[in-house]
């Protein structure tokens, strides 16, 4: 095996309390901390572990987004990726368009594995990996909680409603990662400094010749409804009375 391609999406940091714009057209991102999508960070960690075991020789991180996404790619390089590719786009790229972009990069890079987070924490679409596998006409294993490689095959364990399911797939393939797969490494200052010298290629999205036309339109964003304050009751009888008063029971 030679190469692993890893997708890194730029998202609002999971510790940030997201605010909806007053006009409901989106969320406030000005001055907000941005980070690597946590599921993608796990995908990168798994790729690095595979390389460290000698099952891959190169890890390439890819991001589709604005010029500022270079920050997240540099973080990926600091974690240990060998090089980075930014497909620059100032507009939102939907899952199908993202899958088409990855397919173009696959034609150029010829990876054995494409590792993606199972979903982004911003839109929670959970679609790009599946769409990419279909376009590439290669096997897929989603929600991976364990990945084992054996030559030209991968054995992937995934959590399903009934318990655990283990799939064996031929490579090349697409694998999407769940939070239980691993714990990403901590990036130290020397690695951050080294990452500045690693190659980062920028490609204009228009140069790929990919149809990125929007397939749907977001009508409005609404913040979650405010929760009413809880009511303390002394005993079961008082609880029953309160539920009857609200018409929840008869």
What would you call each of these model-derived segments?
Residues 1-250:
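N-terminal glycine-rich FAD/FM-binding segment characteristic of electron-transfer flavoproteins
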């Amino acid at each position: 095996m030679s190469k692993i391609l890893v997708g890194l999406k730029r998202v609002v940091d999971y510790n940030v309390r997201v605010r909806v714009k007053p006009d409901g057209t989106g969320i406030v991102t000005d001055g907000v901390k941005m980070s690597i999508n946590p599921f993608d960070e796990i995908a990168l960690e798994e790729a690095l572990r595979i390389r460290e075991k000698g099952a891959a020789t190169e890890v390439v991180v890819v991001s589709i987004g604005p010029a500022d996404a270079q920050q997240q790619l540099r973080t990926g390089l600091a974690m240990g990726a060998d090089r980075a590719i930014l497909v620059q786009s100032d507009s939102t790229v939907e899952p199908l368009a993202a899958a088409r972009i990855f397919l173009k990069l696959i034609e150029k890079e010829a990876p054995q594995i494409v590792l993606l987070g199972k979903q982004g924490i911003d839109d929670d679409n959970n679609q790009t990996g599946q769409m990419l596998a279909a376009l590439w006409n290669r096997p897929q294993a989603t929600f991976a909680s364990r990945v084992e490689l054996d030559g030209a095959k991968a054995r992937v364990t995934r959590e399903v409603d009934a318990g655990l399911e283990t799939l064996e797939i031929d490579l090349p393939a697409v694998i999407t990662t769940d939070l239980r797969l691993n714990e990403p490494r901590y990036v130290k200052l020397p690695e951050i400094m080294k990452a500045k010298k690693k190659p980062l290629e920028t490609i204009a999205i228009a140069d790929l010749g990919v149809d990125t036309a929007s397939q749907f339109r977001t009508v409005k964003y609404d913040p979650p409804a405010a929760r009413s304050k809880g009511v303390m009751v002394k005993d079961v009888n008082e609880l029953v009375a309160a539920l009857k008063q609200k018409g929840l029971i008869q």
